[in-house]
Amino acid sequence: MNVLIKKFYHLVVRILSKMITPQVIDKPHIVFMMTFPEDIKPIIKALNNSSYQKTVLTTPKQAPYLSELSDDVDVIEMTNRTLVKQIKALKSAQMIIIDNYYLLLGGYNKTSNQHIVQTWHASGALKNFGLTDHQVDVSDKAMVQQYRKVYQATDFYLVGCEQMSQCFKQSLGATEEQMLYFGLPRINKYYTADRATVKAELKDKYGITNKLVLYVPTYREDKADNRAIDKAYFEKCLPGYTLINKLHPSIEDSDIDDVSSIDTSTLMLMSDIIISDYSSLPIEASLLDIPTIFYVYDEGTYDQVRGLNQFYKAIPDSYKVYTEEDLIMTIQEKEHLLSPLFKDWHKYNTDKSLHQLTEYIDKMVTK
């Protein structure tokens, strides 16, 4: 969407949000803007027995996955046709919880008693995002202003460590006063059961008897740059291992494992080794004590096009490989030497993180 179209969209949203008056409702209202269910659903479930009215604005693709939620959750699909309905819901909310960059918020006029809380869809960051992304033309003042309008709509950020707060400050222009050091709701699932038992049960369920290696790469905008690891060759060279390629859903390839029905966190719970690149998943995997090998075949190009941050560049070279042959050799010869990196990114991620957030919501939302 180019700058002029975004500018017009912001204008329409601004006009509508000024025209639409907040609806009178019986209960205090919380609106969730959801692209990633694993970030938002734990919060909604934690509020199941609360007295709040809850509305979820989500993509048409994700809407069906909300059917398991309680009946008192309203769902609005985020399309142009429902724009008025979305703004009506937002206007009556006392708190808005988001998990991503939402263009709508750049034009939306918050009411005086509203707070927007960002629970970002990652435990950390190894690549540039926001205004540090090399794809953003910082010399284009109109483009930068549009991004800033969206970022400035957020009042607070949920974070699990100082490193991520540093990323938000660098990339989104956030301040220390905006940081909520509660930890992230998305990690709550890792504390709800004994991990070793869950791992054994999941492997049994999916018929995996070998060590499981999970490949979860970053999505590349040019689909030709997205590649799976040759499963047959990998398992031939490493007969004691099973490889699963978990690529982005938009990548269609009959040779890639069909694991679309298994969410990434479930696959991670089963895994013995993670293979990734510039994704935040190695940071999340460290919470599970799973080591990561960084298969970075396009490191130079990716750094030039998108940008890799100081935390990526601090990764030891011994954890990086650039070819499938080197990847296989690293597992054969060095697996026992690999330990999880980024464990210090979980200072505030605890089994109390979700409870801390719900207490904060209770404090901030007037009943």
Swiss-Prot record:
Protein name per its UniProtKB record: Teichoic acid glycerol-phosphate primase
Intracellular or extracellular location(s): Cell membrane
Root EC class: transferase
Membrane topology reported for the UniProt record: Peripheral membrane protein
One GO location term (cellular component): plasma membrane
Primary subcellular site in the record, as a coarse category: membrane
Pfam families, per the entry: Glyphos_transf
GO biological process: cell wall organization; teichoic acid biosynthetic process
Entry similarity comment: Belongs to the CDP-glycerol glycerophosphotransferase family.
